[in-house]
A protein has these predicted regions:
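Alpha-helical scaffold segments in soluble metabolic enzymes
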Residues: 62, 120, 153, 221, ...
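Catalytic alpha/beta core domains of metabolic enzymes, predominantly
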Residues: 124-128, 134-247
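Active-site beta->alpha loop and helix N-cap motifs at the rims of alpha/beta catalytic domains
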Residues: 2-145
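Short, flexible micro-motifs
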Residues: 46-47, 80, 165, 213, ...
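A general structural signal for well-ordered alpha-helical segments in protein cores
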Residues: 24, 56, 60, 83, ...
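C-terminal alpha-helical cap/extension of soluble enzyme domains
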Residues: 8-14, 30-36, 204-206, 211-281
Length: 281
């Protein structure tokens, strides 16, 4: 039975544009001390496009070494061979409660290519892996969202443990999640508590943290609360969410973590700096 939880995505911090992991180490300890049970690195929040492969390993290791809980480590979107090498290299620091999350790196042409990519990563890891499932461009034009058929096939061949769900259409996402095997760990992303509130009855059991990156105890209360508490909290969450989206989710998150003196004290170019007025808001 998959467990009900929130998952905190970890952003990197820098000093003079070099990766620094000291604040990351302290940040994940703070998360654990305040009730977080699972953390994750992922292409977006963890800024894989701004990090070298070596730095992604350094970020991942700082989390595994200092977080006393479950760690889901993102694998950068790259060739199948390089992705397999990446997960094999995690052997130097992974623990019993460490997992990896694959990301298909290119356009969609056919499901078999995706299944082979994830299956080979699973084989290199030595067990089922997670899969990041964002919308992707089709090689023949247009876009493609992951289907329950593809995800279930990976699960039934023991290659898949769970997914980071990012279906581009909220109403269609309900049918997508409802069609998944009920033993798949489904981590809802984008919209956080509100999206999870909608998709839980379809079978989602977890969600990517929002306000929990700053105050994890709030999301623990949400998971343990009755519907009435969430309704009373909804107005505050909406204000928080709208303010973050006004300036961009990831930029706002990094700024808030800095203001709370938790991590993300500096950025790496190219990355925008929020104005003093934006940070005050």
């Amino acid at each position: 039975m998959v467990d009900k939880k929130f998952v905190v995505a970890i952003p990197p911090s820098y000093f003079v544009e070099s990766l620094e992991t000291e604040s990351t180490s302290e940040y994940v300890k703070y998360l654990h001390d305040n009730s977080a049970t699972t953390v994750m690195t992922t292409a977006g929040t963890s800024q894989f496009n701004l990090l070298s492969t070596k730095e992604i390993h350094q970020l991942n290791q700082s989390i595994v070494d200092n977080f006393d809980g479950v760690s889901i480590l993102g694998v950068p979107g790259c060739s199948t061979k390089d992705a397999c090498n990446f997960v094999e290299d995690t052997e130097q620091y992974r623990k019993h409660n460490t997992h990896v999350m694959a990301l298909y790196p290119d356009r969609f042409y056919d499901k078999n290519t995706i299944i082979e990519h994830v299956s080979r990563i699973s084989d290199a890891w030595g067990g089922p892996v997670y899969l990041h499932t964002p919308k992707m461009r089709k090689g023949t034009g247009g876009d493609w969202d992951y289907t329950a058929e593809v995800v279930n096939e990976l699960y039934h061949t023991d290659k898949l443990a769970g997914i980071k769900e990012e279906h581009s259409d909220l109403s269609a996402s309900y049918n997508f999640v409802a069609g998944l095997n009920k033993h798949i760990d489904v981590i809802v992303a984008g919209g956080s508590m509100r999206r999870f509130n909608y998709l839980e009855s379809a079978g989602a059991n977890a969600f990517l943290s929002g306000i929990g990156n700053l105050f994890p105890e709030i999301e623990t209360k949400f998971l343990n609360s009755h519907h009435d508490w969430y309704e009373s909290f909804l107005q505050q969450e909406t204000k928080f969410f709208n303010t973050f989206l006004k300036y961009g989710w990831h930029a706002s998150l990094r700024s808030a973590l800095k203001l709370l003196e938790l991590t993300c004290f500096n950025n790496r170019s190219p990355w925008p700096e929020l104005s003093a007025d934006a940070e005050f808001e």
